[in-house]
Regions:
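A metal-dependent, Asp-based hydrolase signature
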Residues: 7, 11-51
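Conserved acidic
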Residues: 1, 21-25, 172
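Asp-based, Mg2+/Mn2+-dependent phosphohydrolase catalytic module
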Residues: 66, 70-73, 86-199
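Short, acidic loop-to-helix structural element flanking the phosphoryl-transfer center
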Residues: 22, 26-27, 44-81, 91, ...
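Hydrophobic side chains within well-formed alpha-helices
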Residues: 1-2, 48, 99-102
């Protein structure tokens, strides 16, 4: 049921983005929860919705994430978290996962009133970092996020976790790895090559 709910949430958010009917991502999450429950013939009480909202703030990170992010940061790369959630929810999630200190910035698409994969959030991230959009590399485990970032002009990397596949109609990311550790290894290798080419 969780996969159905998440898929419905992303679908609702994409429809809103395409049609220009912006709603905060949390509103899509709750609407998708209601739709999924209705499809399953389950009645939701307000307490149930509040419990799901609270759980979204306490999602655990995959085991390799903390060390992979720290390796990237310690190599001198600037890290920013870019999410469709509000900044408040994103900060709560990162705090709970013990990752907040690895990021220079926590950015929300909510700031620009357009959800990813619209180009505005990616461009806002580049602007907040003070770099050109083509100097940003988005790392994501969702093909739609990689597609949006690529269309906005970012370099991309895809975390191909089990069940996650790339859209064959979208330009393939420069980096693909089975988990964030593999992606970090590849990014650091690219950075070393770039350093050797610089005069």
């Amino acid at each position: 049921m969780r996969v159905t709910w998440f898929t419905q949430m992303i679908s609702s958010a994409l429809v809103a983005t395409i049609t220009g009917a912006y709603r905060p991502f949390g509103a899509h999450a709750m609407a998708a929860l209601e739709m999924t429950a209705e499809q399953a013939g389950v009645e939701l009480a307000d307490d149930d919705k509040e419990a799901v909202a609270a759980q979204m703030r306490r999602l655990p990170a995959h085991p390799e994430v903390a060390s992979a992010l720290r390796r990237l940061r310690d190599a001198g790369l600037r890290l920013a978290a870019l999410t469709n959630s509000t900044e408040e929810v994103a900060r709560a999630q990162l705090e709970h996962a013990g990752l907040i200190d690895t990021f220079e910035l926590v950015l929300s698409a909510d700031t620009v009133g357009r959800l990813k994969p619209a180009p505005e959030p990616y461009r806002m991230a580049a602007e907040r970092l003070g770099v050109a959009v083509d100097q940003v590399r988005l790392i994501a485990a969702h093909a739609w996020d990689v597609a949006g970032a690529s269309q906005a002009g970012c370099a991309t990397a895809f975390v191909a976790r089990p069940g996650k596949v790339l859209d064959p109609l979208v330009e393939r990311p420069g980096i693909v790895g089975a988990d964030l550790a593999e992606v970090a290894d590849a990014i650091l290798a690219v950075e070393q090559q770039d350093d050797r080419r610089r005069p």
